[in-house]
Amino acid sequence: MAAEAPSGGEAPVCDSGRSDAICNFVICNDSPLRGQPIIFNPDFFVEKLRHEKPEVFTELVVSNITRLIDLPGTELAQLMGEVDLKLPGGAGPAAGFFRSLMSLKRKEKGVVFGSPLTEEGIAQIYQLIEYLHKNLRVEGLFRVPGNSVRQQLLRDALNNGTDIDLDSGEFHSNDVATLLKMFLGELPEPLLTHKHFHVHLKIADLMQFDDKGNKTNIPDKERQIEALQLLFLILPPANRNLLKLLLDLLYQTAKKQDKNKMSAHNLALMFAPHVLWPKNVTANDLQENIIKLNTGMAFMIKHSQKLFKAPAYIRECARLYYLGSRTQMSKDDLDLTTSCHNMSFQLARCQRQNRVDPSSQQEETQQHTEEALRELFQHVHNWPDSAKKKQLLRQFHKQSLTQTPGREPSTPRVQKRARSRSFSGLIKRKVLGSQMTSEKKNSSPAPESVAMGELKKASKENMNLFFSGSPAGTVTPTRLKWSEAKREGRKGFF
């Protein structure tokens, strides 16, 4: 008989008559939480969208990748899998056909090595990874080769699906480490796949910008991490799972480099050819890209603990897709909204000072307005080159050529202007318009709330997105490109 739940949110113990049968449950009486799903995995809706709506998910992720990285039409089509990838030193389609044929034959025989990556194969290889986690202090791990005879015995056991007791002492850590590299090297394609190859080269070129908007030689780590997070989201599930296991192993190995003498850079030299390099290419084929690939592999090892988390805006987008809301912002708009909110406090402070000293009202207002516009213009100007950046810059220049942020402020003038939907127009109309209103009415609302309200309205007019159509989503790449013209006429998904 089921036990009744006591009041007060206690955790009762239910005894079904057996001494070993105990069930505990907690009743939550917090009314705001009733009817709300409790999600412990922050990427729950991301994974749900990936499995249930793969096309919608891929277009969402790829659109944000193109926001960070400039991908020409051919490279974008390669990333989407729409065209075949042209690689340096490739042996042509015939070699690919025979390689696929041999992989199918191996798969039929249940062979792990040389077969396409599967969850069953990962389960076998996980025995090696688990054993190496216990032996990270061995000097020269992954660099010193093991015994070839023992490696062949271990290889045959894995191919046959035999249970292996690696802790018996029959095999050495170097045998296991070398066999793991052999498994990765014999995959039909690199772990990070051929179609992602050019994107990884572009990620290595992401650099910071100086105050004047010029590109520097300092890597932009935040953008690189964000780009890798997005790129890993569209990896095949088996590749993503094994990559996570591998990078975590290499990260833990590098943490003990004082014992094993294997830094992240040394490990990158060992694994980049198996994880990043296209198959059937040599160092001469890659030429100047070798440094980029090795550096990129070392970067992934160092930051592996951050790379398998979906960006916050992707999580929010997936959550809203399933919870019924149709409004969502992109990463650029989230940054821009934050900038606008910061400026709203400056404008509010400016208005308070103007009401205290009416004699200098117009001059100080114009000065603070120009400063706010210059700050917003500089924030947008520092974005990486993209279509959205060009559209926003055109809005600034179209608003007023004589008052473009970054120039010397012109003579302050207070006059009625045509209604503008741009950020600069909204800021100037709010500041100057509110002054004229405050002179006529003494009971005007607080400047902080007014400034925040107008700037939030600006964000909604320029940045709100909507999932159009049914939840299945009629999301097309053009909607994912944030067309300004479409947003003014009608609202689209992205």
Swiss-Prot record:
On the tree of life, the source organism's domain of life is Eukaryota
The record, for Pfam families, names: RhoGAP
Entry keyword annotation includes Ion transport: no
Annotated GO molecular function terms are: GTPase activator activity
Sites where Phosphoserine occurs are at: 7, 31, 422, 438, 470
Checking InterPro entries in the record gives:
ARHGAP19_RhoGAP (IPR047941), Rho_GTPase_activation_prot (IPR008936), RhoGAP_dom (IPR000198)
Q: Where is this region: Disordered?
A: 399-451
Question: GO terms for CC?
Answer: intracellular membrane-bounded organelle; plasma membrane
Q: Where is this site: Arginine finger?
A: 143
Positions bearing Phosphothreonine: 478
Q: Which UniProt keywords apply?
A: Acetylation, GTPase activation, Phosphoprotein
Query: Where would I find the Rho-GAP domain in this sequence?
Result: 102-308
Sites where N-acetylalanine occurs are at 2
Gene3D superfamilies found in the cross-reference section? Rho GTPase activation protein
Q: Where is the signal peptide?
A: none
Q: Name one GO biological process term.
A: signal transduction
**What role is this protein assigned?**
GTPase activator for the Rho-type GTPases by converting them to an inactive GDP-bound state.
The identity of this protein, by name, is: Rho GTPase-activating protein 19
Species for this entry: Mus musculus
Query: Which gene is this protein's source?
Result: Arhgap19
